């Protein structure tokens, strides 16, 4: 790794160092230490000679491999940490209200006024707390006082808490702010129900969906992801305001969240009937814990992939046959299939690993979506 001089103190530092270890100055590389080409601070390798400007991490490795599939030249606009930088900051009620006021001609910002570095989320945590505060008394009412009237509330709150929380995260990250919240709810409720019905129709066909076998588990991934991708595509085709990758992430997440919430409610009820209260409560906790890496993430990838291959063209049927879209849709299918396979690791290690992989893909698409903002500004200026 080459050495460069710190602009602040003049000491020699590694070219990959983000801050000077001597004086703490934030180091922004403007030229490649190897060939001297001018570069952006967001690039991980020199576009001219390929010299590594940053140490490779999981994000870089995933991005490089996904670039080979998509043909994109991704850039790191934000890290996973950046997306949550405002979570624990103090916010006013007015700021909270403004988050949900968007989607109309008056409340949708012009692309030239959007700063991709502003992408962050914080309302999702408040939503999760609301669910938690509502879940506790329903649980007490049913478990401690034996009042069956609390059971429907316990099931619905337990099933909806995490999928809705993750959905709100995607809603906040869509800084185009061009999809009103009522439409997000529409995609969540209708999309979840329609994709479930479509999946049931697929299950009624003569497929091997026995998750005790590897082939059966993989087929479950096919049978459940194709219906979700179909409904996501339907909504994206119908909503002419959806033009960007971040829109695809949001619409996909909404459909996936609806699918996850309704499916989880069914699992909670079924396990409660067959296994009793303790089993039911275990399912609530387990499904909630694993929700961020499941249906919400998988459907979000499908939506983002479709909007990526569209680029700045009007969405067309030809994009559904685009090789890049089809290859990217294999990712959630494989992730889902492996998730259901009879592979046991301690502490649900397999599902945690798959969650991390899914979110590395999502971060990749978030960065492509933020890069698209700069690309859109150039496109509009032509």
Tell where the protein language model's regions lie, with residue ranges:
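Cys/His-rich metal-coordination motifs, chiefly Zn-binding "fingers/knuckles"
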Residues: 1-64
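Hydrophobic alpha-helical segments at protein termini of multi-pass membrane proteins
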Residues: 45-382
């Amino acid at each position: 790794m080459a050495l460069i001089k710190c602009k602040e103190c003049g000491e020699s530092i590694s070219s990959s160092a983000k801050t000077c270890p001597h004086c703490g100055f934030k180091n922004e590389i403007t030229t490649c230490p190897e060939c001297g080409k001018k570069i952006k601070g967001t690039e991980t390798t020199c576009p001219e000679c390929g010299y590594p400007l940053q140490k490779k991490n999981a994000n870089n490795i995933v991005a490089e491999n996904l670039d080979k599939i998509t043909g994109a030249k991704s850039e790191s606009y934000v890290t996973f940490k950046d997306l949550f930088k405002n979570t624990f900051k103090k916010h006013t009620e007015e700021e909270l209200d403004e988050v949900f006021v968007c989607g109309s001609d008056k409340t949708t910002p012009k692309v030239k006024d959007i700063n991709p570095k502003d992408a962050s989320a914080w309302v999702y945590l408040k939503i999760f707390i609301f669910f938690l505060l509502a879940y506790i008394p329903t649980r007490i009412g049913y478990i401690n006082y034996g009042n069956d009237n609390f059971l429907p509330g316990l099931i619905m709150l337990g099933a909806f808490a995490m999928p809705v929380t993750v959905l709100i995260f995607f809603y906040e990250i869509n800084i185009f702010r061009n999809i009103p919240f009522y439409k997000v709810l529409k995609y969540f409720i209708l999309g979840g129900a329609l994709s479930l019905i479509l999946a049931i129709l697929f299950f009624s066909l003569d497929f091997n969906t026995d998750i005790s076998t590897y082939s059966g588990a993989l087929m479950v991934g096919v049978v459940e992801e194709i219906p979700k991708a179909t409904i996501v595509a339907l909504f994206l085709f119908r909503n002419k305001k959806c033009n960007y990758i971040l829109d695809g992430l949001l619409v996909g997440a909404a459909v996936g969240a609806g699918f996850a919430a309704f499916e989880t409610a069914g699992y909670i009820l079924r396990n409660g009937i067959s296994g009793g209260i303790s089993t039911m409560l275990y399912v609530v906790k387990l499904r909630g814990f694993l929700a961020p890496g499941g249906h919400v993430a998988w459907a979000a990838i499908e939506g983002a992939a479709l909007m990526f291959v569209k680029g700045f063209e009007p969405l067309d049927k030809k994009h559904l046959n685009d090789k890049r879209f089809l290859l990217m849709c294999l990712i959630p299918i494989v992730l889902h299939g492996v998730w259901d396979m009879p592979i046991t690791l301690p502490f649900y290690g397999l599902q945690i690993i798959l969650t991390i992989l899914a979110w590395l893909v999502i971060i990749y698409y978030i960065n492509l979506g933020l890069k698209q903002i700069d690309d859109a500004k150039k496109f509009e200026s032509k």
